[in-house]
Amino acid sequence: MRGLLLAALPALATAAALAVAAPHGSALAEEEEGFSFLGLDLKGSLGEGRHSRYVPPLTNPIFNETPYITTEIRPFYFYHVIPDDFVTDGGHANLFALQARIALTERLAFIATKDGYADIHFDDVLPDEDGFANIALGFKYAFYSDPESESIATAGLRYEIPIGDLEAGGIELQGNGDGFLNPFVTGATTFGDLGLQASVGANLALDTNEDTSIVHYSVHADYEVLPGLFPLIELNGFTAIDNAERSTGALGQLDGVDVFNFGSENRDTTVTIGGGLRYRFNDHVMFGAGGETPITDKDNTVMDYRIYFDLVLTL
């Protein structure tokens, strides 16, 4: 499966090269006709006669998928702090990941949105751990696209392959079970300088004894206060719909939020709020930075707060 990502590198390298060479401040609506590679419409939703505004969400990067069809690579990093009330008396994690998206047509895209390397440090109880996360691949299709009103709606399906190797104190954090199917719907629209986006989906465990199935949901709002500068605010939620049997007792209430799945028998709901900004250097390069923290009880979640940084390189 890693070969699929490697096969995408020629198109993604082209996107990165164009991003570096692009003139500062040009408008997406003034782009040339859609760039074609091997007969693919790599411009996707963006370009002349198509959508002219693209501000992807920042927090919940694994589940809150943009509805726009793009060819891009998106390296991201987050610093994750574990609450002091957690069974380990706190700790922190660093996650480095790379997302890839390839527009096959104006409405259809291949997406690879979960991977990465995690370095986890616990303050007590569990040993420190580092290793690779699972990989999630799939496709999405824009079933509604109206550039005139800057509105778009997209449905997609991802499969999370359980090939990660994260384990702490005998608790498998990644690489357990048979993976997940993740159907989702996402949409966006704009009102002048205001951009709105929302998504909902279900991360369905294929081995329901080992992993917990959840519903995830997100809303995003951004506003262009200066040319290319977009402050944003986001709300994300994660609710168990089918608990597993792998973690019981004190561990049975643990909520791994988006990256980790403890297979808990009594996982609760976590809702987070996030904020930050994006800055668009030109039509092909956008930077993002922000933070996120739960607004629900932190007693049984592994998240106290997160700090995010990413770079969106779009063809």
Predicted features along the sequence, with ranges:
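Cleavable N-terminal export/targeting peptides
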Residues: 1-43
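Transmembrane beta-barrel domains of Gram-negative outer membranes and organellar outer membranes
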Residues: 28-207, 214-315
